[in-house]
């Protein structure tokens, strides 16, 4: 059986390639039916914000790719409640439905996976 993988995305979509790379890993892993989840933490929650204008800063819009995650079998999607609140985001206004977790639940989530990649 394949080891489970948690991808933690901590970078805003306009702050370099890390957000795109985390998404690419998730889509590739999902395409191969790997057991994986994706956690949006710190500035990574900005990837989930609706109505972004990435072209204004010459970046690619990740919203369509994020919305493709469930089609690739990546359904375990999580966001840190503290990160959302601190950045003025609400779970109801995100481009993708995610499970919002508090700090204790985040610790349990990370322990649940065999391998963790942070970008």
State each model region's role.
Residues 6-20, 52-53, 57:
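Short, glycine-rich nucleotide/cofactor-binding loops
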Residues 19-38:
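Histidine-anchored nucleotide/phosphate-binding helix
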Residues 36-42, 76-83:
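Short internal beta-strands
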Residues 45-47, 85-87:
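Short, active-site-adjacent cap segments at secondary-structure transitions
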Residues 49-52, 91:
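Short acidic, glycine/proline-rich loop/turn micro-motifs
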Residues 55-82:
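A glycine-rich helix N-cap at a beta->alpha junction
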Residues 87-118:
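C-terminal structural segments of small proteins and small subunits
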């Amino acid at each position: 059986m394949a080891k489970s993988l948690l991808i933690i995305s901590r970078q805003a979509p306009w702050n370099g390639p890390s957000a795109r790379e985390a998404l690419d890993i998730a889509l590739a892993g999902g395409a191969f039916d790997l057991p994986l989840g994706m956690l949006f933490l710190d500035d990574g929650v900005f990837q989930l914000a609706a109505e972004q204008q990435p072209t204004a800063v010459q970046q690619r819009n990740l919203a369509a790719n994020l919305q493709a995650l469930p089609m690739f079998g990546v359904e375990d999607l999580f966001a840190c409640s503290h990160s959302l609140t601190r950045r003025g985001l609400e779970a109801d206004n995100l481009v993708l439905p995610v499970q919002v977790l508090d700090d204790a639940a985040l610790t349990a989530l990370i322990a649940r996976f065999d391998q963790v990649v942070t970008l």
